[in-house]
Amino acid sequence: EAGYATPLPVQLGGQPHVIVSSGRAYSAVKVADGQEAWNLRWFTRYGVNAADAIVDGDQVFVGSGYRKGCGLYKIGAELTEVWKNKNLSTQMNAAVKIGDHLYGFDGDSGGPGKLRCVSWKTGEVVWEHATGFGALTAADDRLIVLTGTGALMTAPATPKGFKPSGRTRVLDKDCWTAPVLANGLLYCRNSKGHLVCLDLRRGQ
């Protein structure tokens, strides 16, 4: 059964694996022989497990939309739940982990989404900002945020709050794809397939 998330290459126990999603689960598969190392049953409405898992050391975070929520698990012979709640329902795009915090969008497209900072260790909400639904990436400890209506913002990634340095409309709605930064160029796309490229290189 196919899923929406991109297969994520990771090292688990010193061996290469990929974490893949289906409409019913997230699982880790050994690259060498295709054997499943672990399987986390994760049922989301419409079978939409679209956000990539996040692995840090011996822990894995997963989340999905439609009010399914999120959870952090310790990786071992079996997965052990660390915490699970509905504080970060990442519908289409993964959150990003910087330091001891997750930054991502809670909520579904077309609804009152919020940008949230959530503690990696406890799952508690540290702050939230009423941006509406959107997508984000990060570079140099800064968040690059694209709202669902096409507004682009950047801000320091800090648990002290969301303080964007500016806001610029770069596209029409609906923007569901995370911005991509490569070689000083920032690419943003909307659901109609319109693509913009912004040159962020200084003095060039």
Q: Model segments located where?
A:
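Short loop/turn segments immediately following the C-termini of beta-strands
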Residues: 21-23, 65, 107-109, 148, ...
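Structural motif
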Residues: 28, 67-73, 110-116, 150-155, ...
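Short loop/turn segments that connect beta-strands within beta-propeller blades
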Residues: 30-34, 74-78, 119-122, 156-160, ...
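C-terminal hydrophobic structural anchor segments
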Residues: 126-164
